Amino acid sequence: MPVSMAVCETANVVNAALRESLGGNSSAAGSSIDQAKSGEDSNGSLQNHIVANAKRILMAKIEYEEVPNYHESVLENLKSKYIVIKPGNPGAINGFGGKNNTGKVVGANGHDNNGARKQAEHPNNQSHHNNHNNHPHPTSNPNELPKPKRVLYPRENIRIGWKQSERKWQVGTGMINVGNTCYLNSTLQALLHIPALANWLVSEQAHLENCNVAESGGGCIVCAMAKTLLATQSNQSAVRPFLIYSKLKQICKHMVVGRQEDAHEFLRFLVEAMERAYLMRFRNYKELDQLVKETTPLGQIFGGYLRSEVRCLSCNHVSITFQHFQDLLLDIRKADSLEDAFEGHFSRERLEDMGYKCEGCKKKVSATKQFSLERAPITLCIQLKRFSMIGNKLTKQISLKPRIDLSKYAARSPAAQAQPLTYRLVSMVTHLGVSQHCGHYTAIGSTDTGSYYNFDDSYVRPIAMQSVCNTNAYIMFYELDLSQAASPAANRPNGVRLTNGHSTTPVPAATVSSPSPTRFIGPQLPPGGVNGYSNGNAQKTAIQFKQHHQQSQQNGFQLGTGKFQDTAKPPLVGAHAKGDANPVPTANGNKSSSTSSNSSSNHKSINQQQYLPISSEDEDSEDEMTPRPTTAQLPSMPKMTDDHTEKPKSPVKIQVKTPVKTPLKSLVPYESASEEEEAPQPNPRKRRSEEDSSESDQESGQTNGHSKTNGSLTNGSASSSVHVNNSKQKTDAIDEIFKSLKKSADSDDDDDEEESSIQLTNGWHPQKQSQSQSKAPPSPKTPPSPAVIKSKTGIWKVTRNDEVDDIDDDDDEEDEAPAKIQTPSKTHRNPFSSTKPSTESPATPGAKRQKLLNGSAVKSHQQPRVGNGYQSEATSNGSTINELLKQSHRGYGSSVLSWNGKPAELEKEPFELVCAKRIAGHGSVDGSDIVESSVAVNASSGSDSNDVVVIALLVDAREQRQRDLDDDEENEMDRGRQRKVKSSGSAKANNASNSTPGYNPFQEYEGQKRWNKNGGGGGGFPRFYNQNFRQNFQQRNKFKFNRFGGPGSAKFQQQRALQRHLAAGGGFSRRQPSAQQQQQQS
């Protein structure tokens, strides 16, 4: 047990030592001679004895005894240095809702809602402040928020809401942008539209008159803000915030005039500059501690305290700390709404494993951390983290609400949490742009009428509540709404004013908890007294309002959210119950609305007497209570008039037998099978206007909302005959060109096949229509498709057959038309390729291309789809396809995959079609032609000749492919195993083999002409009779004889015929056009 020490008196111990020393020395004195010696010895002996006795006394046992004042003198000092884990008096812990140590009665949100500071009885309160000035919280619980020893500006002096001031608040003017100052203008507009801050600035009138800070004639930064606020309230045009702009360096040193800055950064520096300016009013402001500096007006308005609880997962020890904040930075990477961002911010998170040193375990352990609101601020500033780690801006949409409830995030007792902690949106700063380094800032602010305005530099315009909630916000300011937690006798912060300017007595909102069945929205009048009413009269008020509401509708009133239009009597101001949220049409056509957005009204007036001030609870549950129409309508449904609503719905009748010519267009294409197969529409706007013009003559009784005609299919485009063959959609592009060049001999089979496909899904067969009615305008891009109609009888298609017969007849005429035989020249791979005669006239390619583009050809269903299902618009004469076909499909590398990732179809069998296409009509690279084979020359025009030509082409293609394979084996590159021998013969052979494959006789002719022009041996005879030329020709080309399959092959015969022709003098001295060659060969 702690006691105080009681030690015996030192004088008694010294006296005992002297007596003991003197008593021993007195017996030793014997004679007078020895008196002097004995005196000296006695003095030394006395000193030695005193020292020895003092040491013995200091080492003696100490006796203790308890004193009654130990608890007050010692333990109180120890309490200020250590944390009491288990206090002896449980009642010493003071929670919210009760009396704290300073004697102030606080509410559920941490401050006095009644606005009166009350002192509680504390016997030692004055002694604590006098004796322990070094400890501002001598008797407070360590788990509670410490109390400052001095309050610079009481929290109760903050006036919340526009109605707390006697001043009449205007909307405010805009601010002129003086050069990249949109961040400054928007921040100032957001701050000046906070009621608590505006009321404080107006109350600083005495300081404005006596401010001793002379900086450019504008005073301190607080005076500059107050003067700017008064300027925006008094002027009618945009103002220039030069008082703030001139102090930019004083606000923040690194900010440069004319440069873009961050609005939130400027906001933080501006608030700190205002706090410094306020602290300078006190003499010893530098000696004040941090808790006292946080009691400035700016700290009381924006400041709050977060409670951080770190719990050890090993010993469950909880470490509680408090943190002062003036804004909340919310992470929105995983949030889609503001509520989600709050949940993520105040959720429990786990710290790094074994990274927290626990005070109880005295070692590093795993722990969890959670934030909560110890004391909520009056004005909550929220910044959304719209920046990523890589420097980009997060432009995602975050849904907002005009009211938020933070009761579940408050660190209070369950009884105190029952009282709501509600905030209402007062202003915000938005950023427009895709990057955080550039863009434009705007602001949104609320007024005393409850409406919101958008401030874009010097432009000010009203904005609807829905637009405010859907804005890409960056900084938001929410002000505490005390009306939800106010007592019944307390006055309401915002009054109710009618359109004629007369205001009623302010009354508080009915506080309805969640179990209460009745929910009131908007301003209400009490049924009885003026000072207020209890919750028991709420149901009666709702009934009375419902009756008056019906009467007001008959009288022609329009009850809006922010305005009242008085036509006969003053309407009764009230609120809708939750069950009566649906608007009811009035007698004069107007509708009453139960929403709380002022900007949702359709009428705006300059005179502010026409606005109804919305109180703080008028906007409650704004997102929950929205007017819903009686009948749900889809966006695609047309607006039904009164006449249509009374008509009974009748089943839709579809008539196909008798087409009637009307200006109405049929609505068939909107239900086409696919986007690519929709029937073309000539002009959607024109068609729509025609439908509107004749809408009065038609019935509109459908359930899907689409307007119908009288039931007949009148538009030819809706019933145009287009035959779709799905089995032809994967044909190769080159196969398409090859089939378009040759004339089809089996058109009758195609017609039979098409006729079999002309039937409807559910068995309906349409009647044939005339040619004039069924002609549809051609579509230059989209291929036509059979129309699909959805009705109650099922899904069916409409096609016709007359156009097919007409197109077949046209094709037969083209087949029978005589055409000149065109001899295509050699190709890059095959110099002696046989070709087929072209049966097209010079005008045929253009007509054929036009038919293909219009989509009206018979074989349109046979046209393949190139790529990802899109149809190629090019025909056989297209330059791009011709250029691609001239190139080798084999290339110099491995096979190339197609666009859809599958192996190309130009391998194996399709190669025959490629060779056939080359032989058919593309000629050689240099544009010259060769003599075609006898099979092609003797072939006659018509279907028989086409079959013969096709068979010959396929045979030649297979042989050419085999020769190419053999040529590849012969021309393999030397890999070093075989030594190259340089000789004249091998050099010629190598030159021939390394050159372009195939022999070019015309190049040989030109070369021999240059060699033998002045040389001897030839004389004046033609060089064709020179035997050296023939020997050289044979010597150079003998290695190709085996390649052509021997003397019996067709290609060998072609080569020999050409050689004989050249040897007989049939060569050409100059290249001639293709037409002259054909005439000469014929």
UniProtKB/Swiss-Prot annotation:
Pro residues biased stretches: 777-786
Entry keywords, A to Z: Hydrolase, Nucleus, Phosphoprotein, Protease, Thiol protease, Ubl conjugation pathway
Region Disordered, residue ranges: 24-45, 104-149, 488-886, 960-1026, 1040-1082
Primary site of residence: nucleus
Active site: 182, 440
Pfam families assigned: UCH
UniProt-listed Enzyme Commission number(s): 3.4.19.12
Annotated GO MF terms: cysteine-type deubiquitinase activity
InterPro entries attached to this UniProt entry: Papain-like_cys_pep_sf, Peptidase_C19, Peptidase_C19_UCH, USP_CS, USP_dom
Protein localization: Nucleus, Nucleolus
GO CC annotation: cytosol; nucleolus
EC category name: hydrolase
Top-level lineage group: Eukaryota
Compositional bias of kind Basic and acidic residues: 640-649, 729-746
Residue positions, PTM Phosphothreonine: 658, 662, 782, 823, 844
Catalytic reactions on record: Thiol-dependent hydrolysis of ester, thioester, amide, peptide and isopeptide bonds formed by the C-terminal Gly of ubiquitin (a 76-residue protein attached to proteins as an intracellular targeting signal)
Biased composition (Low complexity): 503-518, 588-607, 766-776, 983-995, 1053-1063
Residue ranges annotated for the USP domain, each copy included: 173-481
Subunit structure: Interacts with atms/PAF1, but not with CycT.
PANTHER family in alphabetical order: UBIQUITIN CARBOXYL-TERMINAL HYDROLASE (PTHR24006), UBIQUITIN CARBOXYL-TERMINAL HYDROLASE 36 (PTHR24006:SF758)
Protein name (database record): Ubiquitin carboxyl-terminal hydrolase 36
Organism listed in the record: Drosophila yakuba (Fruit fly)
Taxonomic classification: Eukaryota, Metazoa, Ecdysozoa, Arthropoda, Hexapoda
